[in-house]
Amino acid sequence: MKTLTDSFVYLGHWPSAGSFGFNTDILATNPINLSVVFGVLIFFGKGVLNDLLDNRKQRILNTIRNSEELREGAIQQLENALARLRKVETEADQFRVNGYSEIEREKLNLINSTYKTLKQLENYKNETILFEQQRTINQVRERVFQQALQGAIGTLNSCLSNELHLRTINANIGMFGTMKEITD
């Protein structure tokens, strides 16, 4: 290894008068040496640089293509999610409207049912009151009739004698006989 570096050092010490050689002293470089170095770099580095740039370009294009595919997939998923959201919102609105309608219908049914029940109870109450009034009236009539009958019997028994009683009976029998003849 030492001989290799020594050979480069010897190259740097060649006489520079009228000959072509490499100047290894960076501070003492001239335009010719620089152009040779740049020429070698461009000639050999061009292919490597082109390959690097082509690879980089291909990776960037692949990344862009993948990003576009992912974007399209994301857009499709977003559209699907929005469609599902609209569908769910529509169904929720329908459930809400149907729920409110059902609640209103049940409320009206309950009110109507309660009204009918109250009406029936009112009718039963009125019928019961009417029945109790009739029964009370009949009881009062029966008592009044019994008292009047007892009073009349008492009056008749005290006022009528046997002879008057027999004449009244005979007159009534005569009236019944006359009525029978008229109807025949």
Swiss-Prot record:
<comment type="subunit">
    <text>F-type ATPases have 2 components, F(1) - the catalytic core - and F(0) - the membrane proton channel. F(1) has five subunits: alpha(3), beta(3), gamma(1), delta(1), epsilon(1). F(0) has four main subunits: a(1), b(1), b'(1) and c(10-14). The alpha and beta chains form an alternating ring which encloses part of the gamma chain. F(1) is attached to F(0) by a central stalk formed by the gamma and epsilon chains, while a peripheral stalk is formed by the delta, b and b' chains.</text>
</comment>
<keyword id="KW-0472">Membrane</keyword>
<dbReference type="GO" id="GO:0045259">
    <property type="term" value="C:proton-transporting ATP synthase complex"/>
</dbReference>
<keyword id="KW-1133">Transmembrane helix</keyword>
<keyword id="KW-0934">Plastid</keyword>
<keyword id="KW-0375">Hydrogen ion transport</keyword>
<keyword id="KW-0138">CF(0)</keyword>
<dbReference type="GO" id="GO:0009535">
    <property type="term" value="C:chloroplast thylakoid membrane"/>
</dbReference>
<dbReference type="Pfam" id="PF00430">
    <property type="entry name" value="ATP-synt_B"/>
</dbReference>
<keyword id="KW-0406">Ion transport</keyword>
<keyword id="KW-0793">Thylakoid</keyword>
<keyword id="KW-0813">Transport</keyword>
<comment type="function">
    <text>F(1)F(0) ATP synthase produces ATP from ADP in the presence of a proton or sodium gradient. F-type ATPases consist of two structural domains, F(1) containing the extramembraneous catalytic core and F(0) containing the membrane proton channel, linked together by a central stalk and a peripheral stalk. During catalysis, ATP synthesis in the catalytic domain of F(1) is coupled via a rotary mechanism of the central stalk subunits to proton translocation.</text>
</comment>
<dbReference type="GO" id="GO:0046933">
    <property type="term" value="F:proton-transporting ATP synthase activity, rotational mechanism"/>
</dbReference>
<keyword id="KW-0812">Transmembrane</keyword>
<comment type="function">
    <text>Component of the F(0) channel, it forms part of the peripheral stalk, linking F(1) to F(0).</text>
</comment>
<keyword id="KW-0150">Chloroplast</keyword>
<protein>
    <recommendedName>
        <fullName>ATP synthase subunit b, chloroplastic</fullName>
    </recommendedName>
</protein>
<comment type="similarity">
    <text>Belongs to the ATPase B chain family.</text>
</comment>
<keyword id="KW-0066">ATP synthesis</keyword>
<dbReference type="InterPro" id="IPR002146">
    <property type="entry name" value="ATP_synth_b/b'su_bac/chlpt"/>
</dbReference>
<feature type="transmembrane region" description="Helical">
    <location>
        <begin position="27"/>
        <end position="49"/>
    </location>
</feature>
